């Protein structure tokens, strides 16, 4: 929702979008002090926010099964919390990376930066 806003998702998407921009701004402002700032932009992760009820509602609205909804990306594979954790770990251990936003969404082309 940060780069692909949906109807009535402003209260969710706006802060997420601002936070991704802030990660980049901090990299500019604090990089000369050796401080790195990166972000992870994930999509469709089962969580306390994206509940089974929400997944069912969204799948029904798109006339697809819940499995197909969760695999609705270019890789046709559900993105799991473990995948997102690996992205955070990668950025935390990449000492020469700053100002990056790593997208973990299986290739959701509708949500790619334009």
Residues covered by each model-derived region:
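Active-site segment of SDR-like NAD(P)-dependent oxidoreductases
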Residues: 1-4, 108
């Amino acid at each position: 929702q940060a780069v692909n806003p949906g109807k009535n998702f402003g209260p969710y998407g706006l802060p997420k979008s601002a936070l991704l921009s802030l990660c980049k701004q901090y990299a500019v402002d604090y990089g000369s002090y050796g401080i790195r700032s990166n972000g992870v932009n994930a999509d469709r992760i089962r969580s306390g926010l994206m509940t089974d009820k929400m997944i069912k509602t969204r799948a029904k609205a798109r006339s697809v099964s819940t499995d197909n909804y969760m695999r609705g990306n270019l890789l046709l594979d559900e993105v799991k919390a473990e995948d997102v954790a690996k992205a955070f770990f990668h950025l935390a251990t990449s000492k020469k990376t700053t100002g990056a936003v790593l997208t973990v969404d299986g290739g959701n082309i509708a949500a790619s930066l334009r």
